[in-house]
Amino acid sequence: MHFTQREQDKLMLVIAADLARRRQQRGLKLNYPEAVAIISFELLEGARDGKTVAELMSYGKQILGEDDVMEGVADMLTEMEIEATFPDGTKLITVHHPIV
């Protein structure tokens, strides 16, 4: 089985998000890469589930809160952009201040 670079990147994101969720379930606060992985994964899955870009921009702010991340992470993550595949093509999802 051969994967394109984009497919490999998506698989790595799934693995990173899974590891971050496991750490979160153990009561650990998430660091910057873990928070980005979880939010990115949830946005990509939302697109796959048929949500609109507008719905995902709003949903992106509900995935994690300041209590879920280490001190300073919310301040560092002021904007996220991720390209997702929708039924009508690939679109950019931008979430401003994803951790509130």
Swiss-Prot record:
Keywords: Cytoplasm, Hydrolase
EC number: 3.5.1.5
Classification via InterPro entries: Urease_gamma, Urease_gamma/gamma-beta_su, Urease_gamma_sf, Urease_subunit
GO biological process, one term: urea catabolic process
GO cellular component: cytoplasm
Pathway: Nitrogen metabolism; urea degradation; CO(2) and NH(3) from urea (urease route): step 1/1
CDD domains associated with the record: Urease_gamma (cd00390)
Gene Ontology MF term list: nickel cation binding; urease activity
Subcellular location: Cytoplasm
SUPFAM superfamilies recorded: Urease, gamma-subunit (SSF54111)
Keyword check for Cytoplasm: yes
Reactions mediated catalytically: urea + 2 H2O + H(+) = hydrogencarbonate + 2 NH4(+)
NCBIfam families attached to this UniProt entry: PRK13241.1, urease_gam
Complex and partners: Heterotrimer of UreA (gamma), UreB (beta) and UreC (alpha) subunits. Three heterotrimers associate to form the active enzyme.
Family: Belongs to the urease gamma subunit family.
HAMAP family for the chain: Urease_gamma (MF_00739)
Protein name: Urease subunit gamma
Source organism: Staphylococcus xylosus
Gene: ureA
